[in-house]
Every structure is written in C-alpha cells, then in structure tokens.
C-alpha cells in the first residue's frame, strides 16, 4: 500500500509537510469535473432554454 494513501484508500488533501497533495494545475486537468462547474453550466443552460420559451411566447404579440 502506498505511503500517501489513507486507511480508506483515498489520497489525503495535504502532505505531512503541509503542501497540497495534488497541484492546483492538475486539479483542473485530471479527474472529474468540479460540481460547481457542472451546476453553473446547467444553470446557464436552463436560463437559456427558458429565455427561448419566453421569447417565443411574445413573438407576434401586437402584430395582429
């Protein structure tokens, strides 16, 4: 078993000397996407789709 892994097999957030276990540059390029990034993209998509519906509902109003 690796010296860096905890008893549950996960890599700790910090090394014993206090440095981060994973460099911040690699946090953005490896592994899964951060939840806040997924939620932000999803929220923007929902607002965009709702905007399209509101735009469509007002198209033609007053043209008749």
From Swiss-Prot:
Entry keyword set: Membrane, Photosynthesis, Photosystem II, Reaction center, Thylakoid, Transmembrane, Transmembrane helix
- Say where the protein is mainly found: membrane
The record describes its membrane topology as: Single-pass membrane protein
Q: List where in the cell it is found.
A: Cellular thylakoid membrane
Tell me yes or no: is Methyltransferase among this UniProt entry's keywords.
Answer: no
Look up the domain of life of the source. Answer: Bacteria
Q: Does the keyword Transmembrane apply?
A: yes
Name the residues that span the membrane: 35-55
A Pfam family this protein belongs to? PsbJ
Q: Mind telling me which GO cellular component terms the entry cites?
A: photosystem II reaction center; plasma membrane-derived thylakoid membrane
InterPro entries according to UniProt: PSII_PsbJ (IPR002682), PSII_PsbJ_sf (IPR037267)
The alphabetized list of GO BP terms reads:
photosynthesis
Q: Describe the function of this protein.
A: One of the components of the core complex of photosystem II (PSII). PSII is a light-driven water:plastoquinone oxidoreductase that uses light energy to abstract electrons from H(2)O, generating O(2) and a proton gradient subsequently used for ATP formation. It consists of a core antenna complex that captures photons, and an electron transfer chain that converts photonic excitation into a charge separation.
Quaternary structure, from the entry: PSII is composed of 1 copy each of membrane proteins PsbA, PsbB, PsbC, PsbD, PsbE, PsbF, PsbH, PsbI, PsbJ, PsbK, PsbL, PsbM, PsbT, PsbX, PsbY, Psb30/Ycf12, peripheral proteins PsbO, CyanoQ (PsbQ), PsbU, PsbV and a large number of cofactors. It forms dimeric complexes.
Similarity comment text for this entry: Belongs to the PsbJ family.
Protein name as it appears in the record: Photosystem II reaction center protein J
State which gene encodes it. psbJ
């Amino acid at each position: 078993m690796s010296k860096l892994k905890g008893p549950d097999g996960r890599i700790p957030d910090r090394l014993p000397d206090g440095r981060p276990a994973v460099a911040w540059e690699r946090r953005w390029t490896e592994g899964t996407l951060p939840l806040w990034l997924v939620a932000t993209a999803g929220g923007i998509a929902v607002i965009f789709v709702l905007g399209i519906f509101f735009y469509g509902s007002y198209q033609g109003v007053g043209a008749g």
